[in-house]
Amino acid sequence: MAEVEKLKQLQLQREALKKRGEQKVKETEKKRTEESVQSVCPECGSRQLVHDYERAELVCQNCGLVLDEEFIDRGPEWRAFDHDQRMKRSRVGAPMTFTIHDKGLSTMIDWRNRDSYGRAISSKNRAQLYRLRKWQRRIRVSNATERNLAFALSELDRMASALGLPRNVRETAAVVYRDAVDKNLIRGRSIEGVAAAALYAACRQCSVPRTLDEIAEVSRVSRKEIGRTYRFISRELGLKLLPTSPIDYVPRFCSGLNLKGEVQSRAVEILRQAGERELTSGRGPTGVAAAAIYISSILGGERRTQREVAEVAGVTEVTIRNRYKELAEKLDIEIIL
């Protein structure tokens, strides 16, 4: 019983630290927002601003204008030359993240049986430490909501890893799922379905598009359920998502076909011209992107067959034939097959 009381006290301390940490994060975010007001170059209007830490300057990457100088380096005062050295000298934990149910603000008892000085724990105290560690794992997920989040976020991470999605997409998906939980949109729906729909919405928000078929392949629910749940949560959460642009698919498809940068640039230009003439309206973005890449590969001397392009893009050869003929005719592109 004494051990349980200790663990309850630890949990109360953990919750107090968690609240203090969240308040600190809010203050830091507010400060960062105030500091980043000047996020547009006054000379050329570009948003591509880069911090040059060697010269302590904020430089526009487009025109080279120095917007700020002698800014404060908020990094650590120590230097490290490899990963092990960095881990030894670091005095803080990982940053806050929405992809963990407790946002990464909780603590845990280390699995190595050593004290704070690095000395081995005596055999007499190891049994007690084992019990404390077991109870610590149990109380870390204390209620049904946290259990729901823990399972859903692990499912999100699994699907994102299978699709090779970057960190910002995972964070956005976790935020969308948390909002759905807060508004009680999970009731009557499967956790996997809502998680997959949140991931699909995050991909669209971050301009890293994935099709419903691709999401369905790595999830445990059907494409139909993902689409239905996605429409529901986007309506209830008020997500304002623009239609997916075919241009967003070009880099991934070109990489899958091992095409050079010139072919990719030409495909993007073809799609821009098609967009200006409204040739992409009402058509699937993957099919239009695949057709533009097919045309570009022929013009660039790196011909890929319609079957190869169709396999990478996840569309049929008939779709590519119809779209590429339409693009070639409307844009006056002469193709020699």
Curated annotation (Swiss-Prot):
GO cellular component: transcription preinitiation complex
Molecular function per GO: DNA-binding transcription factor activity; TBP-class protein binding; zinc ion binding
Any GO BP: transcription preinitiation complex assembly
Transcription regulation found in the keyword field: yes
Disulfide bonds listed in the record: none
Binding site residues for Zn(2+): 41, 44, 60, 63
Source domain of life: Archaea
Transcription among keywords: yes
Keywords linked to the UniProt accession: Metal-binding, Repeat, Transcription, Transcription regulation, Zinc, Zinc-finger
Zinc finger (TFIIB-type): 36-68
Chain's role: Stabilizes TBP binding to an archaeal box-A promoter. Also responsible for recruiting RNA polymerase II to the pre-initiation complex (DNA-TBP-TFIIB).
Family the entry assigns: Belongs to the TFIIB family.
Protein name: Transcription initiation factor IIB
Species assigned in the record: Methanoculleus marisnigri (strain ATCC 35101 / DSM 1498 / JR1)
UniProt lineage: Archaea, Methanobacteriati, Methanobacteriota, Stenosarchaea group, Methanomicrobia
